[in-house]
Amino acid sequence: MSYPTRAVRAVRLLSLLLCATTLTTACPLPAHALAEHTKSSSAGNNLTTNMDASHASSSSYTSRLALYHSIEALTGVPWYRLAAIDQYERTLTVAHPKDRKHAERIIGIFVTGPVWSGLLNPDAEDQNPRSIELFSGLGQDGSGDGIADRNNDKDLLFSIASYLGKYGNNEDEFGIAVWEYYHNSRSVQRVQQFAKLYQRYGKLDLVSQAFPLPLGSIYSYRSTWGSRRSWGGYRIHEGTDLFAGYGVPVRSTCYGVVEMKGWNPFGGWRIGIRDLNNRYHYYAHLSGFDKTVHNGDIVTPGQTVGWVGSSGYGKPGTQGKFPPHLHYGIYRDNGWTDWSFDPYPLLRQWEQSERKALKSGKTKGTSS
């Protein structure tokens, strides 16, 4: 039996390396791809966290915005797209804090060592830009110090921007770049929604909140999340019922993008709005919608999106199977699915904050 010479073995090894490197370049893994995702109901109950946009300080917003603009100047990638990816990554860390631990910094983007340095790189913590490039890693030196550090804000954001820039700058090309990074259509939708909000308002602190019903109207509510429901099969109640008369305005609780609008057999006429904390706000049993609000539209805190009714529990148009009320639900996206959690504490908080603001002569929404 003959054995290959050292030269032959070296050529074979080099061929395998080049092949694997090509595959890695064609399909970069998402920043969280190496983390194990588990579907636990407790993930959806993570109601408040310091990573939420609503808890960020004004100085943090200023620092982040300045960094986005500086990287835009270097790469040509619009700042609001960088902001959108950064914010989306923050929401993933909220959902998976144990899997996405990183040093405290301005930017919330999380990249694993192997993705940063290259999957075939023997040094998962490599910071040499040349060897990282050799192994098709994501990491680059954005600060000019000759080091590609995945915990350096400039290096991290410059690397993401450089990756995006390879695909082009129009909306479709941006969507393709995000898809190739995450391989998840939900991620593409979320990032594009966030970018749309940031582009519209030109700022990051879009954290104002409003109570879903006018405080001057007659209404009542209590915590009903988790109670049993039987229509259509036994299930738990994923929301809070706010009882009010027919036609009472239903208002957006947040800055967000309309994600869903139409009929649902359970919720009747309903509308769903996605906010920058990656929470889905669900308004159901409406008597109708504001006709100026459409799927994909941006809404603001306190904006009327519909009116209280009693629709649902049947085919389109079914009304009156229960007293008129607003079913308000809230869900958190963990990157793969939405998890319901009890909205009652937030409703109480928004109601009280808005009352205090009205008493002090302020009419705008308040931060949650």
Walk through the language-model features, giving the residues of each.
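N-terminal export signals and maturation junctions of secreted/periplasmic proteins
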Residues: 2-5, 10-70
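Acidic, glycine-rich catalytic/binding loops that coordinate metals and/or anionic ligands
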Residues: 209, 321-368
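Active-site loop architecture of trypsin-fold serine endopeptidases
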Residues: 232, 308-325
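Zn2+-dependent peptidoglycan hydrolase active-site motif and core
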Residues: 253-295, 316-319, 323-324
